[in-house]
Each structure stands twice: as C-alpha cells, then as structure tokens.
C-alpha cells in the first residue's frame, strides 16, 4: 500500500468487499469507497492527522479556498484509523439506513468480511453486543468504526451509532504467498509496497 498525497484512491470498482486505503491526510487527497465497508488509515503519518468524514469528495456545493477546502475528502468510507500521534478524527452523519444504501450494493460490514481484519469481530461484539442484546453480531452498518491509535486524540462519531476506541489501530501487511492465487505458505511479508517494488521488477516476485 503506497502513501499518497494530492491523489484520488478509488475502491469503487473492486466489488462488494472491504477496501483498506492508507494515506497521510495530505492536501487534496480523495478517498473514494463504494460498496462494502471501506477503511481510511493513517498509521504512517509523521505528525497526526485532521480527518473529517463529513467533507465529501463529491460535494455539490464547492468550498471556497480555505484551510478546510485543502483537507482530505471522503466518499462512502465507513472505517477510520488514526496515526500514532495526536489526531482529530470525525465520523460522518450516516446511520444504518444510509449505510445500507451507500454504493451500488450497500456498505454494511457483512459476516463474510468481518474476519478479514484480525480482531475486528471480537471488537465489534464487545462494543455492539451490550447495545443489541442479540448475541454474537454477524454484521455492522449502524455507523462508523473509529480507532484512534497512539497519541492524545480528539474523536467525534457524529451521526449514527458509531463504535469508537481511542487506543486500537488498523494495521495492514502484504503477504507474499507460495502460489500466484494467494494460497500456500507465506514467503515474505511487507509493511508497504515500497520495498516490494524492486523485488517485483527484478523478478523475485511475479
């Protein structure tokens, strides 16, 4: 996963799944999700980020040039994970009805994809089960999931029934497997695409 600045990262065309996008909160960045429960993560930001999911990537009303208009913008993003520094993290105002209609097929985190992130199912059950009293939770789409990471963060869920933890954070590693279809033993693991690029160019990994 490459950090990006001033670009659009788009998961809208990858189907109904879970999109994991990592950036640095740079000016002009656009995080565009789609169907499925999509995450914006900022684990590598060196200073701390100011993120507001209410700043839409496709806002019909243009914002006049200002500090606000330079911030990263988001569309159909449900999960947010901060950096190891002091962050300001704001969720959006969507509720269960809006999230179910986000993207072509809705953006509810379904049972099939809950285990794509280790520990996510346990976290959701720990926070959501006391609210629902329905036993194990097999889906979540009532609001955002916001994880602060290290640092003294300011977190606001805003609309919806959000799940918030100030210490947890989302991490992603790229696993290189024995077979081209992703099966088999793990050969190597990388924290980002950057160290993989020369190994792919020289044919070490295809």
Predicted regions and their residues:
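Acidic, glycine-rich low-complexity segments
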Residues: 1-206
């Amino acid at each position: 996963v490459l950090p990006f600045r001033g670009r659009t990262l788009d998961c809208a065309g990858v189907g109904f799944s879970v999109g994991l996008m990592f950036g640095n909160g740079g000016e002009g960045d656009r995080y565009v999700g789609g169907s499925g429960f999509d995450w914006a993560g900022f684990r590598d930001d060196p200073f701390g980020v100011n993120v507001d999911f209410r700043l839409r990537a496709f806002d019909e009303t243009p914002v006049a040039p200002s500090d606000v208009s330079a911030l990263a913008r988001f569309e159909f993003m449900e999960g947010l994970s901060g950096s190891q520094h002091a962050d300001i993290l704001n969720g959006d105002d969507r509720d269960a009805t809006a999230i179910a209609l986000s993207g072509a097929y809705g953006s509810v985190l379904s049972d099939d994809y809950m285990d794509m992130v280790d520990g996510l199912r346990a976290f959701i059950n720990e926070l959501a089960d006391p609210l629902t009293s329905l036993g194990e939770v097999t889906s979540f789409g009532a609001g955002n999931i916001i994880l602060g990471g290290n640092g003294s963060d300011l977190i606001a869920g805003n609309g919806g029934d959000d799940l918030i933890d100030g210490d947890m954070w989302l991490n992603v590693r790229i696993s290189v497997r024995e077979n081209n279809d992703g099966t088999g033993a793990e050969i190597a693991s990388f924290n980002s695409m950057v160290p993989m690029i020369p190994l792919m160019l020289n044919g070490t990994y295809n």
